UniProtKB/Swiss-Prot annotation:
Organism: Mycobacterium avium (strain 104)
Subunit architecture: Part of the ribosomal stalk of the 50S ribosomal subunit. The N-terminus interacts with L11 and the large rRNA to form the base of the stalk. The C-terminus forms an elongated spine to which L12 dimers bind in a sequential fashion forming a multimeric L10(L12)X complex.
Biased composition (Low complexity): 172-196
Entry keyword annotation includes rRNA-binding: yes
Assigned protein family: Belongs to the universal ribosomal protein uL10 family.
Record's function text: Forms part of the ribosomal stalk, playing a central role in the interaction of the ribosome with GTP-bound translation factors.
Protein name in UniProt: Large ribosomal subunit protein uL10
One GO CC annotation: large ribosomal subunit
Length: 196
């Protein structure tokens, strides 16, 4: 590869690193071209899957300001540059790796830090953003429906509830009859003295 071609390749890879929300790094030793094409299809729009020389990828990562991945760039390495939801891409790669033992997840990079294999697999085990938002909306809807039912209850139901509580309280501890207050004669007010 000519020097100008290498510089162009490094610039392209660096741009992919900068635009990606996450990167997933794999070893593809033993996979056929058909397997790689199948993996790319399974990633659909969530990521692009690229194979490049490790030296070029190391330079591109350095140019993009990404650190901590150099040890992952050894052997036949391919990178999934995730532009969509990281969970979807990680799920696709993890599923493919289970079906094709030749694909090995090496790690990744997301939110400014390197990810271990275990962290990439934990991301793959998460539910997608849409599912989590749907669950949150469902929980909120249920609570809002309960509150709306409470606020829409007729005033008569509230009055009956208050009366029932009052009767229950009266039955539990009968109120003592109030003692009549002892009457005391009222004193006549004193007349003011005239100073004449």
């Amino acid at each position: 590869m000519a020097r100008a071609d290498k510089a162009t390749a490094v610039a392209d890879i660096a741009e992919q690193f900068k635009e990606a929300t996450a990167t997933l790094i794999t070893e593809y030793r033993g996979l056929t071209v058909a397997n790689l094409a199948e993996l790319r299809r399974s990633l659909s729009g969530a990521a692009t899957y690229s194979v490049a020389k490790n030296t070029l990828v190391k330079r591109a990562a350095s140019e993009a300001g990404i650190e901590g991945l150099d040890e992952l760039f050894a052997g036949p390495t391919a990178i999934a540059f995730v532009t969509g939801e990281p969970v979807d891409a990680a799920k696709a790669i993890k599923t493919f790796a289970k079906e094709h033992k030749a694909l090995v997840i090496k790690g990744g990079y997301m939110d400014g830090r390197a990810l271990s294999v275990a962290e990439v697999e934990r991301i793959a085990d998460l539910e997608s953003r849409e599912v989590l938002l749907a669950k949150l909306a469902g929980a909120m809807k249920g609570n809002l429906a309960k509150a709306a039912g409470l606020f829409n209850a007729p005033a008569s139901q509230v009055a009956r509830l208050a009366a029932a509580l009052q009767e229950k309280k009266a039955a539990e501890c009968p109120a003592e009859a109030p003692q009549p207050a002892a009457e005391t004669p009222a004193e006549a007010p004193e007349a003011p003295a005239d100073a004449e």
